[in-house]
């Protein structure tokens, strides 16, 4: 799989300018592309209603169900687990509003474009975008942080009702879309099949004209009415035949692609996937291992790296994947409730002395190994470990050789609800 060019890696995803109320702005982020933010630069999130195994959770349109009341019982959404069970650490548990502060609207605020105002149960006013009430996350500390939620991992119907960042539409002609991946913001067509560019083409000029080339590479045709816009231009292949180009590079689909969002075409010499912006750089000491399933991220010795994902079964659907969350969830999966066994099987990925991160998405945090809680850097007895989106990453002792991924999908519903997942850069 070819990587993005240096120019593409540094480029930022263009977006449509949309009307916004005073006090809001758009910020470019490493993982999510352009997102809406408040006056302090805090990313805005939505919590759309989602169908779970046994009911629904999340905000219906034009209504917030995130309340300033501590939920104490499970909701029974993930059958066969019953509702009404006590949630862990109730003495420390916080309300939905404490973790997800609503974006409050002033009494004199007026709707603007797709921005509307909803009334909360306590009478306060809250901003909504496209009918979805908006929130900030207590996890975000700096402008441009997106630690509260991500659109990156699509884990299916067994996932919690997740919060995700909200942003303006990407600046695209009809027939295209952008998909978030670990490699970057991937450009695909409206059927979610990858588009590609060729090193043999010139600026706004296609050199794929032979029958041999055109049997494998299909020009992405532009309609007669298509007009250049922003980073998009139109190439005249022949009289009446027009082709889309992005950043002056003519676009193609690959006739041998059998799956959506494929990287197979980039295996052909001189051909590359296209990214609206490149992805965050993983730690320099990490490696990429070729496996029977695809390309997986690994640490310096080739051991697969995993992230932990967790959402509780309350009506609030709060995440439980951070080190400040109740650790009972992780202990149940990684060690059957046995702390020592968990630490024997799953290990934090240590950061070497002097190692630094080249991105904001990957960071080095300090952890107290006796409590698994994050502590201040340099605290006596702490260890420096790698984290993705503020959450530590792990290796699994069951992986004996580079490229093994025995820990992938370990947990409830293949790790989608509460468990461990590998960082797949490519699936074959």
Language-model segments: residues:
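C-terminal segment of classical bacterial N-terminal signal peptides
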Residues: 1-5
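Compact beta-sheet-dominated domain cores in extracellular/mature segments
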Residues: 6-428
């Amino acid at each position: 799989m070819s990587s993005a060019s240096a120019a593409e890696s540094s480029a930022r995803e263009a977006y449509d300018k949309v009307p916004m109320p005073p006090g809001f702005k758009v910020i470019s982020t490493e993982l999510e592309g352009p997102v809406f933010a408040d006056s302090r630069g805090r990313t805005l999130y939505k919590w759309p209603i989602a169908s779970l195994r046994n009911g629904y959770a999340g905000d219906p349109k034009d209504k917030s169900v995130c309340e300033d009341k501590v939920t104490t019982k499970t909701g029974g959404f993930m059958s066969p687990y019953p509702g009404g069970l006590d949630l862990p650490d109730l003495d420390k548990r916080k309300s939905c509003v404490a973790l997800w502060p609503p974006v409050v609207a002033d009494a004199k605020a007026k709707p603007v474009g797709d921005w509307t105002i909803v009334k909360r149960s306590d009478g306060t006013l809250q901003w909504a975008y496209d009918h979805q009430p908006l929130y900030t996350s207590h996890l975000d500390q700096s402008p441009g942080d997106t630690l509260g939620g991500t659109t990156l991992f699509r884990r299916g119907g067994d996932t919690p009702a997740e919060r995700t960042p909200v942003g303006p539409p990407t600046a695209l002609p009809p027939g295209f879309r952008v998909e978030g991946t670990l490699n970057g913001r991937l450009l695909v067509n409206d059927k979610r099949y990858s588009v590609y560019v060729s090193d043999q083409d010139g600026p706004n000029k296609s050199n794929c004209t032979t029958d041999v080339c055109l049997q494998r590479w299909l020009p992405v045709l532009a309609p007669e009415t298509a007009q250049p816009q922003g980073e998009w231009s139109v190439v005249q292949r022949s009289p009446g035949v027009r082709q889309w180009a992005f950043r002056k590079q003519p676009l193609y689909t690959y006739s041998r692609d059998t799956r959506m969002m494929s990287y197979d075409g980039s295996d052909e010499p001189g051909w590359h996937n296209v990214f609206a912006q490149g992805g965050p750089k993983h730690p320099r000491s990490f490696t990429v291992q070729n496996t029977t399933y695809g390309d997986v991220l690994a640490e310096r010795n080739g051991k697969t790296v995993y992230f932990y994902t967790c959402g509780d079964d309350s009506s609030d659907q709060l995440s439980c994947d951070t080190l400040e969350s109740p650790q009972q969830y992780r202990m149940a999966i990684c060690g059957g409730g046995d702390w020592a066994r968990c630490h024997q099987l799953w290990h934090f990925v240590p950061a070497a002395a002097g190692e630094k991160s080249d991105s904001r998405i990957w960071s080095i945090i300090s952890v107290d190994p006796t409590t698994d809680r994050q502590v201040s850097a340099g605290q006596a007895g702490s260890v420096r470990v790698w984290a993705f989106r503020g959450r530590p990453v792990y290796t699994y002792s069951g992986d004996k050789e580079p490229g093994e991924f025995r820990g992938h999908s370990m947990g409830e519903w293949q790790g989608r609800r509460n468990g461990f997942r590998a960082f797949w850069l490519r699936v074959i």
